[in-house]
Amino acid sequence: MKRLPLRTLMRALAILLAAALVLLMPALVSRQTAPRLPHAENRTLLRVWVTSSVGGGQAWLKEQLKVWEKRNPGVMTYLRTVSPEEVYAENAVLPDVILYMPGDFTAPEEIFSPLSGELHAVEPLLRAGRWRNQQYGLPLCYGAWVLAIDSAIEPGNAATPAPTTLLGRPAATDPAQATEEPGFPLEAASRADIPLQAPAGCGLFTLSGLLTERPALPDDFATLTASEVYSGFLSRKYASALLTTGQLTALTSLTASGSGFPFRALVPREIITDQVWFASVVEGASEAAASLLSWLTSAESQRALTKQGLYGVRDDLRLYAAGPEAQVETAAGRALTAINAYIPLADAQAAAWQVFIGREELAGGLLPLL
């Protein structure tokens, strides 16, 4: 059989390729012109800085940022944790939104723009974000303080959390009827090596109201961090300890799963807290900043706070049904006092100590901090 010349074969292949391109051209054009989501370079970048957060707050925030981005495909967020000093650094390029705790900033007018419009938060929390009659901080969520008591010193009164639907907590139904709880077991606690421990700070306002009589206090009382106190109580080093509500939720979950131990919690009749997480908008921020803050205080977003044992800022939403969490929510509805976000931390801690040791009445100690 006679073989075709190489030149003839090349011509045939060229004709076939040309025909294939003609057939595929409509599909290629259609694929190139199909609508697509905005590329990163065409999306608005919203920068969010966090200088400090309430326990569990960052986990909630990251989850909510993902949801908000999906609902706003033209915007992407960049989350960064910084120190308050970095915000004031020379030549710092400030973000659009800053999230912080009380004491991080003492001159909000130098950094933040006043907020306006409808703000979905209860008045005691909004008031804590005001400075010189301007609303600089929007409260996003808050925690509180409770006194946890180990079952080892009073096995008859300890409460083992029952299995429930979410992290050892009841599902959100009608709040259970409150019952009278026994007070602090002074005699039983006094027999322990370390009867009571508490971290430094404004939790002492709460502790002073929970104790009518006090056991002997350790030398390092009110000098530790909240994390150190929680670790000590978890290892059963302390007979009782002042914990944040987020720590209480974590301990409840551990106990319900068999990793913790029975305990009970004393909840104050009124909530006094410095555990409020604020958000502020920086001057010149993107318009998307307002949309983000609205989402974070929406009912849908606030419901997710239960995963972290935190409390919502809205007056039209109840998150907990029973247990200490519900008692805290009820107490906050009765009376809620939040330390002003822009008071120096040292001033707030000193005032709380003066109230705890009895040198100042509660009202007098709180007044300069509001």
Name each model-derived stretch.
Residues M101-V146, N157, Q177-A188:
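Hinge/lid segment of periplasmic solute-binding proteins
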Residues Y136-L140, W145, A158-P215, S235-A239:
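Extracytoplasmic/periplasmic solute-binding protein
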Residues L217-A285:
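Extracytoplasmic/periplasmic substrate-binding proteins
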Residues W277-V313, L317:
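Bilobed periplasmic-binding protein/Venus flytrap-like ligand-binding cleft at the lobe interface
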Residues T306-L370:
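C-terminal capping/gating helix-and-loop segments adjacent to ligand/active sites or protein-protein/ligand interfaces
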Residues M1-P102, R303-A304, G364, L370:
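Conserved N-terminal structural module of periplasmic/extracytoplasmic solute-binding proteins
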Residues W145-I149, A279-S280:
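Short glycine- and hydrophobic/aromatic-rich loop-to-beta-strand nucleating segment
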Residues E85-Y100, F105, T225-A241:
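Short helices/loops that flank or line small-molecule/ion binding pockets
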